[in-house]
Amino acid sequence: GYHMFNEYGNIFLENRYTDWQNYYPYWTLRNLWMLSKYVPAEKLQIEFLNKWRNTEKYGDDPFAPHRYSFEYLFATTMAGQPLAWFEASNLPEEAFGIRDLMEKYKKVQYDFHQGTILPIGEEPSGRSWTGFQSLCHSKNGYLLIYREDNAREETWVETWLPEGAEVMCTPILGNGKLMATTVGRKGTIKVSLPEKNDFMLYRYEIR
C-alpha cells in the first residue's frame, strides 16, 4: 500500500507505455493530483515518457503525448519525484533542450518538497485549470499551476490560501508573470496563461 515501508524509499506508482497507448500526460497528472490529498506527493515517482515514440498509434487523439511540449510533460511530474521512463539514447536532439528547465527545477525541488503538497483547481481532465500548492510555512510556499487544453486564458483557481489575504506571487519556472493579488472566497486567486498546455511555478508570500 501507499503507507507501508516508506522508510525504504519512494513509491513507483505505475507502468505507462506509448507502445500500449496507455500514457496520457493528463492521466498521470490526474493520478498524482487525486493521490496528493492523502499521500505525500513527494514520495511518489511520477513518469514522463519519450513523446516522439509511437506517435502513429495515437492517430488524431488531441491528448496524445506528442501534442505537448517535452517541458510540459516534465512539469506534470514536478510535485512528485520526476521519473524519466525511457531510454535517453533514443531521444532526438531537440529533447535535450529540457536541460535548462531541469536545472532550474533542481534548485527549488528540495524546498518545494519540504511543504505539504495538496491539490488545487479542477481535477485534471485534459481541459482543466489545475495544479498543486506546497504549504511550506504559514506565510509562504509554492503554487504549481497548469492550463490544460481549454479556451480560458484566465480563470479563478481554488487554493488553500486564506480568504482576504494579500499575496505576492513570484514566477520561478514556466510562463507566469509577477502577480500581486487578494485571495477571494474559498481561497480563489485569478491566474492567467496565454497558451494552452502550459504551466507556471510561483513562490508565494502572504503579506
Predicted regions and their residues:
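Short strand-edge motifs at loop-to-beta-strand transitions and within beta-strands
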Residues: G187-I189
